[in-house]
């Protein structure tokens, strides 16, 4: 299995609900360890740059407005098949279509306020991680499992 890194964002609705720890715990329980974490308020320019791929889509303005409406938690998660595992833990983009036990099914309210973002491919993960975290800010470490 390949050890990968992926970007995960706890969106403003997740921060506002006070579930940061619960979300990080779900990733850790499934073998994804955070190797970089930052709580920040995205600027309009940062959000527009990050979501530039959606610029022509009708929801772009609302997405940028939402992502700048409050603090977010930016994380780099590391583990075996991190991209696919992260997406499995998050669940479908639309919480109504997400499987039971996923973050979006359990915490999200709708497709716009769906609590978390995760990279959709290994290629995009590299781009997204580098957008928010220069390599120097990412710290590798080994887990010591509790007995």
From Swiss-Prot:
Keyword match Protease: no
Known EC number: 2.7.4.6
Cofactor: Mg(2+)
Catalytic residues in the record: 117
One function term, GO molecular function aspect: ATP binding
Keyword annotations: ATP-binding, Cytoplasm, Kinase, Magnesium, Metal-binding, Nucleotide metabolism, Nucleotide-binding, Phosphoprotein, Transferase
Catalysed conversion reaction: a 2'-deoxyribonucleoside 5'-diphosphate + ATP = a 2'-deoxyribonucleoside 5'-triphosphate + ADP; a ribonucleoside 5'-diphosphate + ATP = a ribonucleoside 5'-triphosphate + ADP
Protein name: Nucleoside diphosphate kinase
